[in-house]
Amino acid sequence: FFLWVRHNVPNKVDLQWLKMGGGIVKKGVHPPAKKFNAGQKIIFWAVMIGGLSVSMSGIALMFPFQTTMFADTFAMLNTVGFNLPTNLTPLQEQQYNQIWHGFVSLVLIIMIMAHIYIGSVGMEGALDAMNSGHVDRNWAKEHHSLWVEEEDQKAAKPAE
């Protein structure tokens, strides 16, 4: 986790990448990206946050009627202007847990399936990169131009 966070912090370049649809909308036009593009960052954070959320709701489902996760969450949300019920019965807590667990899981499954498709057969060169662990320099320039520039600058610095 800690090795990847610094590369997955959103920045202004990601907004441009999203506006251009990641290069999927127009053939041959790839927006600039660093080591990870906005789509990869979205997947990273969805898996980190969604995975934690599904794990927590799963634990609550494994040990029914032991937690008040939603009543507590609703109370926090009410402090910023929401008007959600906080006096939930244990049965209501379980119902919210089931709905949340199923919904977040479904969203993650859909996102991961799309990620697998795009990262394998949906993008030319992606499968080769996954198999070898390396990307062609021209592919990297086309899809992650800012990252290539950063790496070139690192390589150009003289050793001290």
What residue spans do the PLM features occupy?
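Membrane-embedded alpha-helical bundles that constitute the cytochrome b-like, heme-associated redox core
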Residues: 1-160
